[in-house]
A protein has these predicted regions:
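N-terminal signal peptide c-region/cleavage motif recognized by signal peptidases
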Residues: 14-16
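Positively charged n-region of N-terminal signal peptides that target proteins for export
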Residues: 1-4
Length: 255
């Protein structure tokens, strides 16, 4: 039932979706920091499977605004990987550089659309040999859509992933959110990554929010799980718990 609901939601908003995407969620939105502004997200991200646990301790996501509509991004994480019967491994994850361009901007409540090409690259260390990162490297080409419908912010993302030494895949995600006050918002996300050959996908659902502690610091939190019955490659718990820093502070409105 939950999987059916998530697929229906994707269908309804794929034709319409600056909204609630980005950390702590997997789905991105068309928003950018603005010229010469920084958005830095630092978080703890646990992924618990029936036969393994992987944690980003921490995950660091750095974004820099180049003009009003362009953003440069770099993300990486220090990973903790625990497999039953073996010692815990630590190491650097894949580097994730990217460029986001919001090529259509409908204003605060109108439709906005962006493209966000990204690479996922292994670093020159032994993380692949130790099973910390996958041997495959990839290029992701997603498009993001956002629009406000009354009190609800809608963000939708869909993309194609070309994989070297692995099956090509796709991603799609939806975030629905509402700002209850100027400082506090709550959101729901459904996220669906998959591969073409073999035809597989792993839908997840999560709930989270943001709380503006003090400009320019924002608390980020999210928790969720897989929608399908737990298998060895399905997460029975996933989360994000961290902080967002908007710099320089004078560039953002104080509330």
């Amino acid at each position: 039932m939950l999987r059916t609901l998530s697929l229906v939601l994707f269908t309804l908003v794929s034709v319409s979706a600056l909204a609630q995407g980005g950390p702590p969620y997997y789905t991105n939105d068309p928003g950018t920091p603005g010229p010469f502004n920084w958005e830095i997200n630092i978080g703890y991200m646990p992924f618990f499977y029936s036969n393994q646990s992987v944690s980003h301790t921490p995950d660091v996501d750095i974004n820099f605004g180049v003009g009003e509509r362009l953003q440069l991004t770099y993300e990486n994480a220090w990973l903790r990987v625990q497999n039953p019967g073996s010692k815990t491994e630590f190491g650097l994850g894949q580097s994730n550089p990217g460029v986001k361009w919001r090529f259509y901007d409908g204003g605060e409540s109108g439709l906005s659309v962006s493209v966000f090409p990204q690479f996922f690259l292994n670093n020159p260390n032994d993380a692949v040999r130790r099973g910390i990162t996958p041997p495959s490297q990839s290029f992701l080409l997603p498009f993001e859509f956002s629009k406000k419908f009354g009190p609800v912010d809608v963000d939708y993302e869909i993309g194609y992933q070309a994989v070297h030494k692995g099956p090509d895949g796709w991603i799609t995600g939806l975030v629905l959110g509402h700002e209850f006050t100027k400082k506090f918002e709550l959101d729901m996300e459904t996220y669906l990554p998959g591969t073409f050959h073999p035809a597989q996908f792993q839908p997840t659902i999560d709930f989270g929010g943001r709380y503006k502690i003090h400009s320019p610091v924002i608390l980020l939190f999210m928790a969720g799980r897989a929608l399908e019955p737990t298998r060895s490659n399905q997460t029975y718990f996933l989360g994000y718990f961290g902080l967002q820093f908007l710099l320089p502070p004078k560039s953002y409105n104080r509330e």
